[in-house]
Amino acid sequence: MARLIWLTGASGSGKDTLLDALRQTEPVRLLVAHRYITRPAQAGGENHIALSEAEFAYRREHNLFALHWQAHQYQYGIGIEVDHWLSAGLDVVVNGSRSHHQQAQQRYGSRLLPVCLQVSAAVLAQRLRQRGREDEAQIALRLQRADAMDILPATCRRLNNDGPLAQTLQAFHTLLAAEKSDFWQISL
């Protein structure tokens, strides 16, 4: 059974870096889905498909999103194409939302594999400063939000990203292999 890997983590935890690295590795039945966002493509951050508010609303009205939500003054969507990819037996990883995990759980049930990317507060603060998108007040708010969102669903698989990217990639692939093995043992 193919899974929807719902990757979440605080802003600055390294989700975009991990997703970019996954796009560069040989796809072993794993696709990385782009999000549709009402944010300009050149705004920095993740590799996404930029839509106007009108385009987003049109797609939503025509059921072209498997999931969609609003956060940080933008609209976010996961295209309905992920359902086709899952039906074809491919695992799909998406940049999910901690606040909208329940919405994904309701739609995908046992096919949902939540993975929570975690970093220490010190590493998170350092990364937020290095990327230069937020001022100190905004960084303080992001750190506060990360701390408040640290209560994760019981089903969430934790993935530490304090170390080098290669280490996180290896841990991610190990986690997926273990989850696939556990699934087949339970299903037999």
Swiss-Prot record:
Keywords of the record, alphabetical order, are: ATP-binding, Nucleotide-binding, Transferase
EC class name: transferase
Q: Supply the name of the protein.
A: Ribose 1,5-bisphosphate phosphokinase PhnN
Q: Which reaction(s) does the protein catalyse, per the Swiss-Prot or TrEMBL entry? A: alpha-D-ribose 1,5-bisphosphate + ATP = 5-phospho-alpha-D-ribose 1-diphosphate + ADP
Q: Where is the signal peptide?
A: none
Cross-referenced Pfam families: AAA_18 (PF13238)
Which PANTHER family does the annotation name? GUANYLATE KINASE-RELATED, RIBOSE 1,5-BISPHOSPHATE PHOSPHOKINASE PHNN
Which SMART domains does this one have?
GuKc
Q: In which pathway does it act?
A: Metabolic intermediate biosynthesis; 5-phospho-alpha-D-ribose 1-diphosphate biosynthesis; 5-phospho-alpha-D-ribose 1-diphosphate from D-ribose 5-phosphate (route II): step 3/3
What would be one Gene Ontology cellular-component term for the protein?
A: cytosol
Q: Which domain of life is it from?
A: Bacteria
Which family does the UniProt entry place this protein in? Answer: Belongs to the ribose 1,5-bisphosphokinase family.
The record lists the organism as Dickeya zeae (strain Ech586) (Dickeya dadantii (strain Ech586))
Q: What is its EC number?
A: 2.7.4.23
Q: Which gene encodes it?
A: phnN
Annotated GO biological processes are: 5-phosphoribose 1-diphosphate biosynthetic process; organic phosphonate metabolic process
Q: What does this protein do?
A: Catalyzes the phosphorylation of ribose 1,5-bisphosphate to 5-phospho-D-ribosyl alpha-1-diphosphate (PRPP).
Q: List the molecular function annotations (GO) for this entry.
A: ATP binding; ribose 1,5-bisphosphate phosphokinase activity
